[in-house]
Amino acid sequence: MKKLLTGFLVACALVVVYGHNLLPSSGIQANTKPQLTTTTSTAEAAGVTAQIAPDFTFTDLVTGKTTKLSDLRDKPVYLNFWATWCPPCVKELPHIQAKYEQYKDRINFVAISLDGEQEAPAQFIPSRGYTFPVGYGNERDISRAYNIEAIPASYIIGTDGTIKAQIVGSMDEADLESFLQKAF
């Protein structure tokens, strides 16, 4: 009887593992280890033009206003990709809120939800009292344009539209402060 039960449990475990691998996925993973890439200094040192941030249109979850990223060139942009199902993303949101309150007059903040639909972030953001701009757009096109494989992913985009720095992984408040300084 014990052998039968053990065999059954092993078979169930194999079905669960194999079945999980067959489920459709966006291919985007949650990343807890920040990996900073500063693109401008590397590009300038190599004598190469810095990468222009891919443009896209997003809709603000609160106002419903549609905006193009390229319309925000009056100030540097802090662009964050996140999702409600991503624990490292959710963990850094209070830090984003604190820095938004500190820098909103000097930096445009945009947090783009990659939840796949607007209902989850539309309920989540107000319930936590966050006031920084959160938008959504065509998740697949935006993810491809920015080559997003893991979130959270953050970018600093200069007023000239070039990517100044990018980081994949959750940041604490000190890390976020240091990252935002790349905007100036």
Task: For the regions a language model picked out, list residue spans one by one.
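Conserved redox-active cysteine motifs that mediate thiol-disulfide chemistry
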Residues: 73, 81-101
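Active-site acidic short loop of glycosyltransferases
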Residues: 73-75, 105, 130-131, 148
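A short beta-strand-turn-helix
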Residues: 55-77
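N-terminal targeting signals for export/organelle localization
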Residues: 1-55
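Hydrophobic beta-strand anchors of alpha/beta hydrolase catalytic cores
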Residues: 78-79, 109
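Short alpha-helix adjacent to the SAM-binding motif of class I
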Residues: 91, 98, 120-127
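Thiol/disulfide oxidoreductase modules built on the thioredoxin-like
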Residues: 123-131, 137-184
